[in-house]
Curated annotation (Swiss-Prot):
This is Heavy metal-associated isoprenylated plant protein 24. Belongs to the HIPP family. A lipid is attached at residue 147 (S-farnesyl cysteine). Heavy-metal-binding protein. InterPro entries: Heavy-metal-associated_CS, HMA_dom, HMA_dom_sf. Pfam families: HMA (PF00403). One of its GO terms (molecular function) is metal ion binding. The gene is HIPP24. The keyword Metal-binding applies. The keyword Lipoprotein applies. A metal cation binds at residues 37, 40. It comes from Arabidopsis thaliana (Mouse-ear cress). Residues 26-89 form the HMA domain. Disulfide bonds: none annotated.
Amino acid sequence: MGVEGTMEYISDLLKKRKRKKKKQMQTVALRVARIDCEGCERKIKHVLSGVKGVKSVDVDVKLQKVTVTGYIDPKKVLEAAKSTKKKVELWPYVPYTMVANPYISQAYDKKAPPNMVRKVPDTASVNETTVDDSYTIMFSDENPNSCAIM
């Protein structure tokens, strides 16, 4: 095993070493219930700014929305926010222009901010519009004597 063998061994070790992937810059929006005073706002800001990778924390008291930006994992941000003993969930609203059918019942929410609707999967609209064929065939205008209720 000469110099070439040693060089190949070292190059194989360097290739096999796993490199950590850099996290993408993300924005996580949270809905935090009962942000009533400046103390609550300060507490949430302090806890979330302590999460590793956080660049900025914005709190909107009126909408009860917290926006966290940075190289972060949304699950870790959610866990840290829950440590404040407040009810926390991911921001459930999107602009109504981003939803395929914003007027279905699952998307409608009275508490939603203006021009926002609740996030719903695309399959929800299909479930509402499907009609059972047996009901449409039951009363046929082509044959009035074929009433299927009897």
